[in-house]
């Protein structure tokens, strides 16, 4: 897993990227937390292209839609329901992605009231024998706040196969 903004501040990730993607290709799971548009060390930190945007969902109570309700990220090992998005603090997510390669799956969507739906908060792709996940949801706020649903979702990401 890479931390928030790692591809903005850790310049050595540019050289380490082939090793990280080899890890995924050989059966590993890599979860990349959000990055900003500015000063990315790579055009796209994933195995397939996507772009980072300034899109965000700032209303923490904004509904989350299950675009792919049978997706493994929403079912394994924890069954995720709308209740798992209750009690979030400050916002849902930030720097959502756009213009992603069709090999990425987008199991979730959300938006602030009166704004268009945003699908780019969570990208999931099989790469070789492994899984690559890019997440724009704000785990760095939800986990320290002890939001139970955030822990369930996070566990699903790190255990994805």
Task: Show which residues each predicted segment covers.
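Helical hinge/lid and interdomain linker segments adjacent to catalytic or ligand-binding clefts
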Residues: 1-51, 116, 129, 135-142
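Short, surface-exposed, polar/charged, turn-prone segments marking secondary-structure boundaries
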Residues: 27-29, 52, 58-62, 101-103, ...
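An acidic, glycine-rich "communication" segment
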Residues: 33-127
């Amino acid at each position: 897993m890479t931390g928030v903004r790692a591809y903005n501040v850790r310049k050595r990730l540019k050289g380490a990227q082939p090793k990280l993607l080899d890890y995924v290709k050989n059966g590993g799971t890599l979860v990349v937390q959000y990055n900003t548009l500015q000063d990315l060390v790579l055009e796209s930190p994933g195995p397939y292209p996507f772009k980072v945007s300034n899109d965000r969902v700032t209303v923490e109570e904004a509904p989350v839609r299950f675009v792919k309700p049978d997706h493994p990220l929403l079912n394994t090992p924890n069954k995720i329901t709308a209740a798992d998005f209750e009690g979030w603090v400050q916002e849902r997510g930030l720097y959502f992605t756009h213009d992603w390669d069709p090999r990425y799956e987008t199991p979730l969507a959300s938006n602030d009231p009166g704004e268009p739906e945003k699908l780019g908060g969570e990208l999931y792709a099989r790469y070789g024998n492994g899984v690559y996940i890019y997440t724009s949801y704000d785990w760095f706020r939800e986990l320290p706040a002890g939001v139970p649903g955030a822990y369930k979702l996070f566990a699903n990401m790190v255990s994805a196969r």
